[in-house]
């Protein structure tokens, strides 16, 4: 029998910053992570196919031997992991950023500037003619004070932050003024790298291209709504427009700030939505995220109880720690004692069940009911295609249980049977492995999403889907 004998502790001790990696070791580490943490392991590898899997792994390991190029290594690893036929289980390759001049073997040097909230407020009171870009700005993770350090050079100093990698008095952004234009340097949240961007000040909004900050003081006469501004600039933001008395929603993704942006659109167009009898919900190309983004529309969609299947989690020491650090740690640190107690109890239960597939509810599914659903819309066309995957598929499964909804388009991509993904680092800084922690319990009924994707109720031609959907709604 083919065996891998390099200890994981040795792998983890190797230099994690190498740009030319030892692919043999990365393979062994990835294989061990999958076998010990992947939620689909017990479904995918059985006594019947185990010899085939062992032979496959031995063959791929022999092909990988001697590979030192990161990119080639990542492709070879992806080829190996394709055995599991799970698009959520995959290798992630991050090409080194070309604008990074800092040696990867050294930590990125972060500037500091001693400045408290009181000192910042005092600075702006005493500065008679501050530069337009100077001020105190807010962001979901930071409060920053942008002050002039010397002519045409500004620091955005952290006054407070919820990001554990940063602390007050560290400089999050540097900005250089050239004439009437600004050029800024943005330091990543994990302090691993930096990038340069054109910077614009639009009334009270500091547009840093990849992040937006809202000016709190000094006061600005014209104030833009930050969420509306984000929607106008964010290609992945949800959108809503009306055509031929049809409300047309587009959800490119359920990631990023989509939840807040969707809530904003629902409130802004509330009256119009409640009086529009035909809707289109366009999920083509939706690559997932949090299905609850779209679930905010449930009062409009609902007609009868909705069955929502639960999941069971593969609980391991590594998965539990990664889950908490990835999804809960920041929220936990900002929570009050009451919420912390609830989280502590759940984490304790998870740790008590290490080595098991764990379903906290002990129920295969739950039934969702809505007491006062809206009358309108009366008809909903929900559009999907081969690029609708993950949480986009989950939302489709829930929404199509409504009598209002007809799913149109083409088969979805099929990537939902195993989810709640964790991203593990490998010894190679450019390669990570994405491992699903959860197994959906509809699998036990013999139903699978991943095999063929979700089938629409009505197949449509690829071109002009919106027009086709409108025509069918009007019939």
PLM regions with names:
Residues 149-151, 219-221, 437-441:
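A short, sequence-level motif marking secondary-structure junctions
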Residues 18-213, 236-280, 284-287, 292-294, ...:
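Terminal targeting/pro-maturation regions of precursor/exported proteins
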Residues 194, 224-226, 473:
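Extended hydrophobic/Leu-rich segments
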Residues 1-3, 13, 135, 205-208, ...:
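Generic low-polarity alpha-helical segments
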Residues 20-37, 206, 228-475:
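C-terminal "post-core" interaction segments
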Residues 106-112, 116-119, 128-130, 219-224, ...:
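N-terminal start-of-chain detector that recognizes signal peptides
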Residues 1-21, 30:
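Bacterial Sec-dependent N-terminal signal peptides
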Residues 7-9, 210-233:
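Long, contiguous juxta-domain segments that are non-catalytic but functionally important
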């Amino acid at each position: 029998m083919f065996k891998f004998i390099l200890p994981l502790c040795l792998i983890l001790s190797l230099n994690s910053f190498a740009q030319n990696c030892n692919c043999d070791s990365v393979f062994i580490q990835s294989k061990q992570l999958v076998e010990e943490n992947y939620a689909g392991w017990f479904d995918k590898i059985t006594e019947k196919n185990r010899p085939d899997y062992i032979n496959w792994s031995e063959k791929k390991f022999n092909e990988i031997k001697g590979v030192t190029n990161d990119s080639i290594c990542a492709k070879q690893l992806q080829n190996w992991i394709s055995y599991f036929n799970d698009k959520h289980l995959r290798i992630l390759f991050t090409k080194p950023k070309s604008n990074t001049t800092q040696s990867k073997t050294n930590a990125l040097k972060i500037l500091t500037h001693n400045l408290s909230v009181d000192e910042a407020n005092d600075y702006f009171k005493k500065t008679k003619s501050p530069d337009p870009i100077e001020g105190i700005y807010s962001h979901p993770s930071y409060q920053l004070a942008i002050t002039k350090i010397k002519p045409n050079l500004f620091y955005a100093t952290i006054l407070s932050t919820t990001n554990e990698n940063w602390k007050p008095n560290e400089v999050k952004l540097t900005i250089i003024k050239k004439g009437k234009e600004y050029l800024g340097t943005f330091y990543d949240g994990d302090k691993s790298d930096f990038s340069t961007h054109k910077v614009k000040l639009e009334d009270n909004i500091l547009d840093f291209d990849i992040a937006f900050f809202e000016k709190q003081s000094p006061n600005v006469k014209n104030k833009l709504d930050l969420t509306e501004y984000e929607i106008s600039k964010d290609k992945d933001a949800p959108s809503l427009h009306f055509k031929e008395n049809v409300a047309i929603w587009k959800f490119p993704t359920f990631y990023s700030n989509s939840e807040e942006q969707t809530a904003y659109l629902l409130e802004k167009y509330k009256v119009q939505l409640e009086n529009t009898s035909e809707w289109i919900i366009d999920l083509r190309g939706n690559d997932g995220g949090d299905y609850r983004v779209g679930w905010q529309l449930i009062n409009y969609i609902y007609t009868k109880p909705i069955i929502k299947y639960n999941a069971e989690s593969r609980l391991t020491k590594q998965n539990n720690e990664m889950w908490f650090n990835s999804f809960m740690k920041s929220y936990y640190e900002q929570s009050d004692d009451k919420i912390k107690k609830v989280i502590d109890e759940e984490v304790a239960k998870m740790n008590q069940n290490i080595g098991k597939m764990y379903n906290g509810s002990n129920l295969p599914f739950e039934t969702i009911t809505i007491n006062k659903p809206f009358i309108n819309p009366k008809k909903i066309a929900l559009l999907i295609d081969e690029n609708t995957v993950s949480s986009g598929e989950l939302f489709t499964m829930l929404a199509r249980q409504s009598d209002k909804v007809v799913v149109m388009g083409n088969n979805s991509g099929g990537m939902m049977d195993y989810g709640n993904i964790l991203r593990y680092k490998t010894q190679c800084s450019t390669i990570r492995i994405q491992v699903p922690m959860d197994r959906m319990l509809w699998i036990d009924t013999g139903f699978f999403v991943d095999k063929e994707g979700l089938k629409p109720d009505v197949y449509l031609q690829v071109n002009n889907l919106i027009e086709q959907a409108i025509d069918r709604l009007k019939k």
